[in-house]
């Protein structure tokens, strides 16, 4: 039998299988169990009462987390004219049109978010096979195709997260770093849940938010007592 690492032993000793933790208790325990050298991300998984096989029950959107994600975000914007100047002023890392597309075709894809104004989609459309598999293709449903590129840049830099139900009807999102105060992590999760509830498909029946699980990059998943969340 493989020998347990020190961290695995700590998890086995301190995590109670099947227990529902209050949010604060879960956040503190994950921080206590985080013994690796880099600051782990804190992630949330939300099981929704939807049938992802039905197109009208796919839940997707974006939330600006009030306390950010703790990550620096690189943003590229496809636009031109005054909108390009506004995007740069808002903090975009790169702004362009055909020349930016050429750079991406050449392999320069060191971006976390790609935004486009509607008039730039003729250029961005050529990049579907490059941006699509990386989750970078601009989409109006998550606010990355918009005439107001400056606001989209500000949102991305402020810690906007994009989400979509997976094949099991689960939303996955980063909600901060393990060194965030529990209250700030909770505010981020509650903001996400509020948007998920706002986007509830009309055809979804029964319990909508079924389960919320909090975890770190390398840590265990802890089920959250929904009564401890305000959203």
Curated annotation (Swiss-Prot):
MF terms (GO), sorted A to Z: rRNA binding; structural constituent of ribosome; tRNA binding
Highest taxon listed in the record's lineage: Bacteria
InterPro entries, per the entry: Ribosom_uL1_bac-type, Ribosomal_uL1, Ribosomal_uL1-like, Ribosomal_uL1/biogenesis, Ribosomal_uL1_3-a/b-sand, Ribosomal_uL1_CS
Signal peptide extent: none
UniProt entry keywords in alphabetical sequence: Repressor, Ribonucleoprotein, Ribosomal protein, RNA-binding, rRNA-binding, Translation regulation, tRNA-binding
UniProt-listed Gene3D superfamilies: 3.30.190.20, 3.40.50.790
GO BP annotation list: regulation of translation; translation
Pfam families recorded: Ribosomal_L1
GO CC entries: cytosolic large ribosomal subunit
SUPFAM superfamilies, A to Z: Ribosomal protein L1
Subunit structure: Part of the 50S ribosomal subunit.
Free-text function comment from the UniProt entry: Binds directly to 23S rRNA. The L1 stalk is quite mobile in the ribosome, and is involved in E site tRNA release. Protein L1 is also a translational repressor protein, it controls the translation of the L11 operon by binding to its mRNA.
Similarity field: Belongs to the universal ribosomal protein uL1 family.
HAMAP family: Ribosomal_uL1_B (MF_01318_B)
Protein name per its UniProtKB record: Large ribosomal subunit protein uL1
């Amino acid at each position: 039998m493989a020998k347990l690492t020190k961290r695995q032993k700590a998890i086995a000793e301190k995590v109670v299988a099947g227990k529902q933790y209050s949010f604060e208790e879960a956040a503190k325990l994950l921080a206590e169990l985080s013994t690796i050298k880099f600051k782990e991300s804190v992630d949330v998984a939300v099981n929704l009462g939807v049938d992802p096989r039905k197109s009208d029950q796919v839940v997707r959107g974006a939330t600006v987390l009030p306390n950010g994600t703790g990550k620096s975000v690189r943003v590229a914007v496809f636009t031109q004219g005054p909108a390009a100047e506004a995007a740069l002023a808002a903090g975009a890392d790169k702004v362009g049109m055909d020349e930016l597309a050429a750079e991406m075709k050449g392999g320069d894809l060191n971006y976390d978010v790609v935004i486009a104004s509607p008039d730039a989609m003729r250029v961005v459309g050529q990049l579907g096979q490059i941006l699509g598999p990386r989750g970078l293709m601009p989409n109006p449903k998550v606010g990355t195709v918009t005439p107001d590129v400056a606001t989209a840049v500000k949102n991305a830099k402020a810690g906007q997260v994009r989400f979509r139900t997976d094949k099991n009807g689960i939303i996955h999102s980063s909600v901060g770093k393990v060194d965030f105060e529990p209250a700030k992590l909770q505010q981020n999760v509650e903001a996400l849940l509020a948007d998920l509830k706002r986007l509830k498909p009309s055809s979804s029946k029964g319990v909508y938010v079924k389960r919320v699980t909090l975890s770190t990059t390398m840590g265990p998943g802890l089920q959250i007592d929904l009564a401890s969340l305000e959203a």
